[in-house]
Amino acid sequence: LKLIALRSVGFNHIDTDYCKEHNIAVVNSPGYGNITVAEFALALLLNVARKVTESYTDYKNGCVKPENLIGTELCGKTVGIVGLGAIGSAFAKIAHGLSMNILGFDKYEKEELKQNYGVKYTDFDTLLKESDFISIHAPLTKDNYHMFDEESFKKMKKTAIIVNTGRGELIDTKALYDAIVNKQIAGAGLDVLEKEETITDFDYIVGLNRLDKFTLEQTIINSQLFRLDNVIVTPHTAFNSREAIQRILQTTMSNINEFSSGNIQNNVIKI
C-alpha cells in the first residue's frame, strides 16, 4: 500500500502514525463542499428556528396549533461560528447576507471576514454567552473533543439553537440531550453524532450486546435525541450535492494521477 486517497476533507478515521511509519501517503479532497455544507447548516438552523419539521408533522397529522409553532427570525440575531476555515467562512458570508451579527472563534483570524463581513472574533466563553445561534465547523482534534460539554451548555442562552455539521465528537451528546430536555437551550440541528455508525450499520445493530459501554450509551442517547421535537438529525449528508460529488471525483482522480506522476498534492501527513 502506497497511497490512501480520501474522498473527504477529514482524516481523523485514518491511523496517521501507522501511515508515517510505513511510508503511506494520505491525500484528501479539500474544498469540495465549502458552500454545500454551509448551505446545509443554514437549512438545519432554519428548520429548528422556524419549526419546519414540527409544522409538517402536525399538519400531516391534522393537529395544527399555531401557538405551538411560533418560531424565531434569524435577521438581526447573533450567530456564533466555531471554526472559520473554508466552510465556516462560507457560512459567515451567508449569515452576513441575512443581516446577522457574527461572532467567530478560531485561532486564526481572517481580515477579509472582519473587514467585509463584520465577523468579530472572540473567546469561546463570550461566544457561548452572547450567541442566539451557534454553528460548528471545526475539525476534530485531540484538544477539542467534547468542547461543547455540560458547562458549555450552562453558559448558553436558554433560547439558543446549536447546529453541528463538523464532527459528532465535538459535542458531548449526553450533555446536549440533558441541556435540551432541561430547557437550558432551545434546540439543535445535527448532521453528525458521536457513534453515528451505530444508527444504520446492521452489524452494530444486531451486535448491541457486544458493544463496549461507551458505544452502547451513545447509541441509546442518539435514539433519545430522535424523539425530541426541537431536534433534527440528518445522516451526515451535509456534503451530499451533485456539484460537491463531482468536485470530489475530480479531486480524487487528480490526486491519484499526480501521485502516479511522482507528485503529491493535498497531502495530509509528512512522510
List each language-model region with its residue ranges.
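Oxidoreductase and adenylate-handling cofactor-binding alpha/beta cores
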Residues: 38-57, 77, 93-100, 179, ...
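Structural detector of well-ordered beta-strand residues that form the stable sheet scaffold
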Residues: 3-5, 25-27, 103, 122, ...
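Rossmann-like dinucleotide/phosphate-binding beta-alpha-beta segment
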Residues: 67-158, 174
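Beta-strand-loop-alpha-helix segment that lines the small-molecule cofactor/substrate pocket
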Residues: 1-3, 14-26, 136, 140-182
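Short glycine-/small-residue-rich Rossmann-like dinucleotide-binding loops
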Residues: 9, 132, 138-140, 166-167, ...
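Phosphate/diphosphate ligand-binding glycine-rich loop within oxidoreductases
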Residues: 1-56, 68-71, 75, 162
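Rossmann-like dinucleotide-binding domain for NAD(H)/NADP(H)
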Residues: 159, 166-271
